[in-house]
Each structure stands twice: as structure tokens, then as C-alpha cells.
């Protein structure tokens, strides 16, 4: 039993979720991995679509009962992939944090392709400020600083895609569609 997983990884505001949405729209045969998290939903996020939002107690219960494939702490919140989230018979795609990637790498039954989504600091900050009507600037700064440390070195990246501009994003989607097609044969 093996799971094929494309993992998108990148700093806050890099556009990981947008890229994943576009890839799933273009390739409906993909299994979109919806992670669990203990953080609160951001404006516009929907439970079961963007994440499964759970309490710390609920998350701990999922881990203890073996219902989590991987679990990690990132930027003061817990994130994880439920056992039922990955499908053996599909190409799985999801957004993961560095600790989640490291956990997935420990599993011998996971064929993992890690794609780093890159955008400039300026564009990432602008995107985060524009994401919500009343952004929490302190939280944006905290995440920015934490990301600098957490993403300093990622030795487990297979590809890096430029998501800095609309044109770059369109080219990244085109290239990622080629990666998906290669997987699917």
C-alpha cells in the first residue's frame, strides 16, 4: 500500500492554497488533502473545505486513537493529516508545513513530491494584508518572522515554483499540471 502525494509548501501569503485550488479544478481526479488544525478559521475559511478545525482536545484524541497519519506543531498551532485524508488509488495533493513534510518523509509507504511555492516578501505581506477586511497586523508580523526561521533551509524540496505575479502563477500552474499528468500517466 503506497500513497502518492504532491505536497505544496511555502510561507504565509505565497499562494499555496490558490495554486492547489487551480490544480484541483484542472485535474478533478486529484484527491485534495484537507488537514486538521487547532487554529481558528480565518475570514472566509470553511470547516471541512480549507481545514478541519478542531480543539486541542479533539486533535489530541485523533492522535492518541491513531486517526492521524502525521501531526506537527507549527507557529503555535497543531496541524495534521487524518488517516482517512490520503487515498491509495489517487494522486493526493495538499498544503503542508515543514514539520508535516518531515513527518511524511518518515513513512516508507509515501511517495512524496515536495513543491516549494515562492513569492517575494513584499508580495506575501501585501497578500496577507489584503486577505481580510481587518487584518491582524501583529499576527501577520509574527507569522512572517516565524516563517523566516522555519523556511530557512528546506533540504527536501523537489521543485520550486514562482508565484510572485499573475503571469508567474499561470506558468507555475502550467508546469505543475505537467507534473500531475506525469504522475497520472
Task: Describe the role of every protein-language-model region.
Residues 126-135, 152-185:
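NTP-dependent small-molecule kinase module
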Residues 14:
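ATP-binding Walker
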Residues 25-33:
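Post-Walker A helix-loop "phosphate-sensing" segment adjacent to the P-loop in P-loop NTPases
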Residues 37-92, 96-99:
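ATP-dependent small-molecule kinase phosphotransfer cores
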Residues 17:
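Walker A/P-loop
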Residues 8:
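Hydrophobic anchor at the beta1->P-loop junction of P-loop NTPases
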Residues 93-97, 107-129:
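Conserved phosphate-donor/acceptor-positioning beta-strand/loop module used by diverse small-molecule
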Residues 11:
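P-loop (Walker A) phosphate-binding loop of NTP-binding proteins
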